[in-house]
């Protein structure tokens, strides 16, 4: 990053007015595709790596793309000729792919620099651990046990294209960049009307930026109203949110919207309120009455409909009572469970028993959805009965075994925080038997004959790292008992959702 520091450090006026000329600088393309820079950056979300585009990158293509942008008429492409008229051996869509990647990099440069100045001087002890998905569950266990209602909101997307352009106008004062941005968006809408694969049009990084800028706009308004509604500020957990670099814009948006909300929304006053956003959704946890939760619900509906011009239905906002309903959160089903706790106390010579009720957050595995995901990938049928993986029979035995072991260990690693391991053991059983059936099918044998020939040592490969560690830490009697059945482990190295969570 220091290599490009001289190019990226602008003063206030230049940073606001000279973004468009960066499209014609070759070093920006190097910044977008350089692997070394991506590895040096600690925040992987700022500069995403894309192997597909690295294969196509070359300085010759960059120069041709720059010349093409100089000739503005060459960028105006009839929709019927998207895949025709190749320019120097490449289709017209390919150059829009390059531009989309470049635009995402250019607009992220001010954000990345602003993020560094935002956290400058602030000390975060082991903040890299807070990037783990599992790091948020201990926080929820500590906080949600004192709450009774959770508002589950599905953030609407997509929105009108002009709204996206208006959002960027708050911090980008370069009219040329905005016009160029609007031109690319509307060209993309024209492509959607034709038979073109989505993944070959624009880079996902481009849409990730659009989505986060849109969500940041919504959250800036929400946080502003939240601070205005109560004098007590809740603890900040910004580092737990996805794409934290966009939270540097919050203070900027507060100045913009301060004149639009002169009155304090007293109806929404609640000092005990926690907000978490994840995977296109957000939850609002509080200890309130159903009346106030319904007010928050319609607040979100009116905010999206009136300000963002999005038809947002109230059915997308669910009010869950934690003691009765299950909250689907990051692949887990969470709910509050009342555990009776009996304590025997003795005062002088008289002893008495005190019955206490302890509230505990119970996290379970959504076995039904996971079985549907396994059935979709041909590991089992919809009833959960294991079947052979026919598409893997052409691989070697070691390759097949390593694939199943890796999947089994990843699932066990992700769902190690489940309060009950029964469903996890069922998933392991499905994968083990599917592996045996796949190997037996490859060797044209039955499952019983195949196991008899190889022995039970084959299944020992599925012994997960958690089982090995726990067997060394705990005594054998404790390890074999039912107490270990309830042990919950949260790991701080899980940065991505498990593939089975994205079954929809």
From Swiss-Prot:
It comes from the Eukaryota. One of its GO terms (biological process) is RNA splicing. It is found in: Plastid, Chloroplast. Pfam families: Intron_maturas2, MatK_N. Its main location: plastid. Usually encoded in the trnK tRNA gene intron. Probably assists in splicing its own and other chloroplast group II introns. PANTHER family: MATURASE K (PTHR34811:SF1). Belongs to the intron maturase 2 family. MatK subfamily. This is Maturase K. It comes from Pseudoturritis turrita. The gene is matK.
């Amino acid at each position: 990053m220091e290599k490009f520091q001289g190019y990226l450090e602008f003063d206030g006026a230049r940073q606001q007015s000279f973004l468009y000329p960066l499209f014609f600088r070759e070093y920006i393309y190097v910044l977008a595709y350089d692997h070394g820079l991506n590895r040096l950056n600690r925040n992987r979300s700022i500069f995403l790596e894309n192997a597909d585009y690295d294969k196509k990158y070359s300085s010759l293509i960059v120069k041709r793309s720059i010349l093409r942008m100089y000739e503005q008429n060459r960028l105006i492409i009839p929709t019927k000729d998207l895949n025709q008229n190749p320019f120097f051996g490449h289709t017209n869509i390919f150059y829009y792919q390059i531009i989309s990647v470049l635009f995402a990099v250019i607009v992220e440069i001010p954000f990345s620099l602003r993020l560094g100045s935002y956290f400058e001087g602030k000390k975060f002890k082991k903040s890299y651990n807070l990037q783990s998905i599992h790091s948020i569950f201990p926080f929820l266990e500590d906080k949600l046990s004192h709450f009774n209602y959770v508002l589950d909101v599905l953030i609407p997307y997509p929105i009108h294209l002009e709204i996206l352009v208006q959002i960027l106008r708050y911090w980008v004062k370069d009219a040329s960049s905005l016009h160029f941005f609007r031109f690319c968006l509307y060209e993309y809408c024209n492509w959607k009307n034709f038979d073109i694969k989505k993944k070959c049009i624009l880079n996902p990084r481009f849409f990730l930026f659009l989505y986060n800028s849109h969500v940041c706009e919504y959250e800036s308004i929400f946080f502003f109203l939240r601070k205005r509604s109560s004098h007590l500020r809740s603890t900040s957990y910004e580092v737990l949110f996805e794409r934290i670099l966009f939270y540097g814009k919050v203070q900027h948006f507060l100045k913009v919207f301060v004149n639009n909300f002169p009155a304090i929304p007293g109806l929404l006053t609640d000092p005990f309120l926690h907000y978490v956003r994840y995977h296109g959704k957000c939850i609002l946890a509080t200890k309130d009455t159903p009346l106030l939760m319904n007010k928050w619900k319609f607040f979100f509906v009116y905010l999206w409909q009136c300000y963002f011009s999005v038809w947002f239905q109230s059915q997308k906002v669910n009010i869950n009572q934690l003691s009765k309903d299950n909250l689907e959160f990051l692949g887990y089903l969470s709910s509050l469970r009342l555990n009776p706790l009996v304590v025997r106390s003795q005062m002088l010579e008289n002893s008495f028993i005190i019955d206490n009720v302890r509230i505990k957050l119970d996290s379970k595995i959504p076995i039904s959805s996971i079985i549907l995901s396994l059935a979709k990938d041909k590991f089992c049928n919809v009833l959960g009965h294991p079947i052979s993986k026919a598409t893997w029979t052409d691989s070697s035995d070691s390759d097949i075994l390593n694939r199943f072991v890796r999947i089994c260990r990843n699932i066990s690693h992700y769902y190690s925080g489940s309060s009950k391991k029964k469903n996890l053991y069922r998933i392991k059983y499905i994968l083990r038997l599917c592996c045996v059936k796949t190997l037996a099918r490859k060797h044209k044998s039955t499952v019983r004959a195949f196991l008899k020939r190889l022995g039970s040592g084959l299944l020992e490969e599925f012994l997960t790292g958690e089982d090995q560690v726990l067997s060394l830490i705990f005594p054998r009697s404790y390890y074999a008992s039912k107490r270990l059945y309830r042990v919950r482990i949260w790991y701080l190295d899980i940065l991505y959702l498990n593939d089975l969570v994205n079954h929809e």
